[in-house]
Amino acid sequence: MGNKTTGDIDRNSFDFLSIIGKGGFGKVWRVRYKQNCQEFAMKEMSKAKIIEKNSVSSILGERDILAQIHHPFIINMIFSFQDEDNLYLVTNLFTGGDLRYHMNKEQSFSENETKFFMGCLILGLEVLHTNNIIHRDIKPENLVLDYKGYLKITDFGIAKKQEKQNSNETSGTPGYMAPEVMNFQNHTVAVDYFAMGVICYELMMGVRPYVGESRNEIKEKILARQIVIKSHEIPSGWSKDAADFINNLIQRKPSSRLGFKGINQIKQHKWFNHFSWKDLYNMRIESPYIPSYEDNFDSNYCEREDNISQQEQELLNKIKSSEQYKTIFKNFLFFNMYDERSNSQKTFINPHKKYEEKQAYSSPQKLKSTIPQLSDEAKETNKFNLFSPRNNKIKHHI
């Protein structure tokens, strides 16, 4: 394995503690940064495999978006770098597992728990949309919990800057994909609100509003009728305001959807009356759901060996000898968005700056002044998890 990098950061800057995930491009490691013992998650991705699977734009797109955004309710990139063989993307380490894992485990959530999760998601989406970014793949697998139960948005592999003409952009996950995307229509950030409504519906009702065996079957069901939660269908312990919130998010017609005129429509919905967005941003609201570490990580899954055929190995070797291989990732280096050595656009707009208080979450300082010291989360037991392999929580673009 190569170990040559550009800049002051490389693979040898870290202690590799354990594998916490695997995917088509490589491994996800729990690592310790030697400079200050901070623990992070590191994606180690084969450059040749990325090229082989035509995923260069996905990987570079995710890196570029994470280079611009830094916020407490999304996964934050700390470093990105490369050597001769691999790309490395270092992010926060979240140990609570993804929302899908917990949905499978708990089967149902209370209204209070759901409102808290939606509040976290709304703040995360607000910062993305303020910076003109559509996530396009909001689903439980892409929402992870930290050890205190705060929800964070992850996986920006198919996220895009919003454009007026984007009808050809049809990536996403059936069941959470907005109808305008499925119908090859131009779309806005409102597609993320539709997905949020589907998740909220699922947390309330235990199933998605539109279910099918294929993308076409789901599309046909969406086109057939508008799903509405009726009063007599509201589960015990849930309010009519919660049902109204969901019903307005899952509107098939974008212009009728809650949030179409701006995210303040969502934040000001009656379900969030008396909800303090400032307290949530400053993490003064305690999560009503605290994840358990006991069974959300399958070490056996991560220990399985990768089997590469001779034919595939020959193809990978051919890719490595190509001119494209030498130049296509040339701007991958990143320290943090305020470091002059990073290839990033320093145009980040934080719509929640008005919420910031002394000692609250703040933007990172230059790397030379060191990353914050070892967090309480990093001091926890060895039961860490960024993804949940037991529930197929391995990113398709790793």
Language-model features: where?
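A short, aromatic-enriched beta-strand patch in the conserved N-lobe beta-sheet
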Residues: 79-80
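C-terminal regulatory tails of eukaryotic serine/threonine kinases
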Residues: 260-352
